[in-house]
């Protein structure tokens, strides 16, 4: 008994010294109710929010969004930016590809007047800017578009044909080592958009891989595989894509869930389309033939008419979204009073 008391006293002394040296909360018991649940930033698609398990992208974590060209990667990221800004948050966009379209971003709901944008010359500059913004503690979300465009300084200053094996992978590994703890402490969500490449000589399994080495795969709490599966047409004219997203890694909820939603050209993710799909799937919206009804009221004949009706009646759309989230037990998304930095475990 005496030995046990001595151990407890020694532990208390050690914890007191650690708190004095490194600040209160440097070491804590997991059972201590000192931290709130993980907050989430909505993605703009109720189906994807449900697949992620917590109602959106987790705050204070590293997110990787990858897929083929024109699959909707940047669109998903910009919707998250728009939702973070709508809740009163501050957002930044590191445009390493020099391809950000402000007009399109504005149509998705991004407040382009207050969006912090950087178009860096080198990968080192891009990641240093991102690290400094995160460490300011004022940021809610930052997007790096894309990992493949983070070209090391040595490669830019060298000549065409020079070999620079592993430079980008080492750069990403170093940056993520520095940024991960800062992201958790500041409650900033970092979204890395990535491209696909094919490994040569793969006989079995998928030859696809992402750029930038393996560090991002390890540090990411959530990895989203975005694929275009169908073209949406109005008559013969293509008006959008049907998109499937697979949550291939998830540290905050069960992984390997999939979500499907519509991306309309010039308008981004169709929130109303996702509400109709999820509402029908879970019995909140009734589909009879081509007609969609909710609580006995007709929404429209055909999905496009029902979508237009919900777009014109946002209160009804919000009510349907709330019922879907309540039925599925999804945590509430980030609200305007919840954008302050929240320490989150890694």
UniProtKB/Swiss-Prot annotation:
ATP binds at residues 67-74. One of its GO terms (molecular function) is ATP-dependent DNA damage sensor activity. GO terms for cellular component: cytosol. Pfam families: RecA (PF00154), RecA_C (PF21096). It is found in: Cytoplasm. It comes from the Bacteria. The keyword Nucleotide-binding applies. SMART domains: AAA. One of its GO terms (biological process) is SOS response. Keywords: ATP-binding, Cytoplasm, DNA damage, DNA recombination, DNA repair, DNA-binding, Nucleotide-binding, SOS response. The keyword DNA-binding applies. Gene3D superfamilies: P-loop containing nucleotide triphosphate hydrolases (3.40.50.300). PROSITE patterns: RECA_1, RECA_2, RECA_3. Belongs to the RecA family. Can catalyze the hydrolysis of ATP in the presence of single-stranded DNA, the ATP-dependent uptake of single-stranded DNA by duplex DNA, and the ATP-dependent hybridization of homologous single-stranded DNAs. It interacts with LexA causing its activation and leading to its autocatalytic cleavage. This is Protein RecA. The gene is recA.
